[in-house]
Amino acid sequence: MKTIAMTIIGAGSFGTALAIALARNGHSVLLWGYNPQHIKKLQEQRCNQVYLPDIRFPENLLLEASLETAITASDNILIAVPSHVFHQVLYNIQPYLDQHSRVIWATKGLEHGTGRFLQEVAREILGEKIPLAVFSGPTFAKELAIGWPTAMTIAASDAEFGKELQQLFHCDKSFRVYKSSDMIGVQLGGAVKNVIAIGAGISDGMGFGANARIALITRGLAEISRLGSAMGAELSTFMGMTGLGDLVLTCTDNQSRNRRFGILLGKGIDIKEAEKQIGQVVEGYLNTKEVYTLAKRIGVEMPIVEQIYQILYCGKNITEAANTLLSRTLKDEI
């Protein structure tokens, strides 16, 4: 019988934070990272000084450098890696899964290069039998790891699996977990909000005020909802944690890499230098192209996403992009 409640793949900031939160709940957790030297350092220091300095690991948080050992240690495998490596990680873990394995991901985004939902990628690689779930919501890794009050949502392909995960992560003192059956809506909210957050950051970097920021957030939510409706998501999902909640958090708090990236662009710093200053993956930059392409393919109007795409991938002047949005044909709000 497997004694590890969950194996977490990805020893970055969010994977580490989830491991700490789950271990704090009294569960045995195994954390795997691709760099053996990094894992060795985590084991020696019993904290992740690179991403979450001075937050100590609970004793029941274990470290592992062998992928095979990590995957075979638990039935529950949670993936917390950037979206552009999600496909490769699934491909790498697939040989070690068995008939009891269940896969969850906290990755936010669409597949790099194809624009596919991560659920589609998982089904293609893992087959139809393995239960799947996505874990998302308005959460910064540091606050979760510290133990400050946080809420997230789990959407699962199987209702009983979703309920088990909800109970596994939920903590009355600090971590409230909601359950959903809308995997499409939960995935979409987590992907598109990062793109809108870049726009909110650009607006603030240009010196526009709170009025402009909230207009971007509100109209950004409308764009997410339109795309979600066209993809078969439940509109109510976008008024919850993984829609409105995650969008507002990412657009307004400077812990957000996507927002900070946008601020730098708004101040006139070029893309490569902005990425360098952020120092970690900016998911919104990678996903802007995928979201824009998806919207065009299915005929959904997303003017904010389109202008951010024009800035990031076509070299459009930021002031010109802002003017394009402001000068659009007048219309009813809803």
UniProtKB/Swiss-Prot annotation:
Top-level EC class as recorded in UniProt: oxidoreductase
Protein name (record): Glycerol-3-phosphate dehydrogenase [NAD(P)+]
HAMAP family: NAD_Glyc3P_dehydrog
Domain of life of the source: Bacteria
Catalytic activity reported: sn-glycerol 3-phosphate + NAD(+) = dihydroxyacetone phosphate + NADH + H(+); sn-glycerol 3-phosphate + NADP(+) = dihydroxyacetone phosphate + NADPH + H(+)
Biological or metabolic pathway of the protein: Membrane lipid metabolism; glycerophospholipid metabolism
Gene Ontology annotations of biological process type: carbohydrate metabolic process; glycerol-3-phosphate biosynthetic process; glycerol-3-phosphate catabolic process; glycerophospholipid biosynthetic process
Keyword NADP carried by entry: yes
Location of this chain's protein in the cell: Cytoplasm
Role played: Catalyzes the reduction of the glycolytic intermediate dihydroxyacetone phosphate (DHAP) to sn-glycerol 3-phosphate (G3P), the key precursor for phospholipid synthesis.
Similarity comment: Belongs to the NAD-dependent glycerol-3-phosphate dehydrogenase family.
Gene it is expressed from: gpsA
GO molecular function, one term: glycerol-3-phosphate dehydrogenase [NAD(P)+] activity
